[in-house]
From Swiss-Prot:
Identification of the protein by name: Enolase
Catalytic reaction annotation: (2R)-2-phosphoglycerate = phosphoenolpyruvate + H2O
Listed SMART domains: Enolase_C (SM01192), Enolase_N (SM01193)
EC number(s) recorded for this UniProt protein: 4.2.1.11
Family: Belongs to the enolase family.
GO MF annotations in UniProt: magnesium ion binding; phosphopyruvate hydratase activity
Cytoplasm keyword on record: yes
Organism of provenance: Beijerinckia indica subsp. indica (strain ATCC 9039 / DSM 1715 / NCIMB 8712)
Residues annotated for Mg(2+) binding in this entry: D242, E285, D312
SUPFAM superfamilies the UniProt entry points to: Enolase C-terminal domain-like (SSF51604), Enolase N-terminal domain-like (SSF54826)
Necessary cofactors: Mg(2+)
CC cofactor note: Binds a second Mg(2+) ion via substrate during catalysis.
Domain of life: Bacteria
Binding site residues for (2R)-2-phosphoglycerate: Q163, K337, R366, S367, K388
Amino acid sequence: MTAIVDIAAREILDSRGNPTIEVDVTLEDGSQGRAAVPSGASTGAHEAVELRDGDKSRFGGKGVLKAVENVDRDIFDALSGLDAEDQVHIDQVMLELDGTPNKGRLGANAILGVSLAVAKAAAEASSLPLYRYVGGVQARVLPVPMMNIINGGAHADNPIDFQEFMILPVGAPNLKEAVRWGAEVFHVLKGALKKAGHNTNVGDEGGFAPNLPSAEASLEFIVKAITDAGFKPGEDIYLGLDCASTEFFKDGKYVYEGEGKTRNLEEQAAYLGKLVESFPIVTIEDGMSEDDWEGWKILTDLIGKKCQLVGDDLFVTNVSRLSQGISKGIANSILVKVNQIGSLTETLAAVDMAQRAGYTAVMSHRSGETEDSTIADLAVATNCGQIKTGSLARSDRLAKYNQLIRIEEELGSQAVYAGRAALKALA
């Protein structure tokens, strides 16, 4: 009854107006699953390959018709008749069919679209919500949202070198209230930026991109907005950074073009340590560049006990890179992006490896998103306790928050909001 009878892919548009792939999977009993694949702006060099057409006459070469064709032909031929409930086998068949270490032949976007759609179809056939189908009866922890409210770096056209400044409403009693707290801070911040003469248009992920001179200036604006919204910084709401340091790592140095400063490895670590001392920062993502293992070690030794250090470009949701990091004592958390690795099975394996090693895991969106809210379900399915899915603007971001609100409501008294317990630095 759960045999795959049809797989159909199409080219749709993401939140930046770029093409991406959407896949529908139909099972013998009529159950269907649909998944749309996201895309990143600042991508790690070690990520799985997103297959683009390269035909400059369509979408500036960004079309995904080759990936669509790979789904409709090769992948469908390989999966037709297989049991959708055997997710591990289905993903393995696709990996073997691709035959490359980085999914470069079929495309990680093609493989992931099918992988997620198969899981959704199987969940429907089982009459279970996706989070319950993937996570079982223990799936009940609602994640702390890491809300990106000021943007810089590759996500904005302003002098700020760091890519994201986030708020984490850990003190909220539940997920729904956490979202409300975040929204209220967001609106207070908007008013403050406007009053100070800054542009309040929003960027790719719904955050503001004001012309502020430094990271410190951005953090000061956010701390004041938290206070003015009636919350306590460092108690109700903490701060987080995504430095995306790979983007400004040049010739072994960290070059802050916006600030006109250059820092070596030790100075970069010391600078981040100073920010943690000066502001209620509880998590820093990609504080060092993706292959700067030495810098990562310096940073981890310096502040790893008091701050969550998240590897995104460093680990790229890849178990082999994560295991290297664990063995070297580098970072203490992994950012989990389904399209960095390209299949549900491998995504879950990365979360499992992190949790077994005592690392935290943060489920994450990409800057190019769609209305697909799968990652909300996966955050609950894995009980990872943290989700990063943008600001409190743009429906491609809100789709995930709204899905979490629905899941919390559905779980009722079983639901647990992760709160402070999600972050070991606060435990």
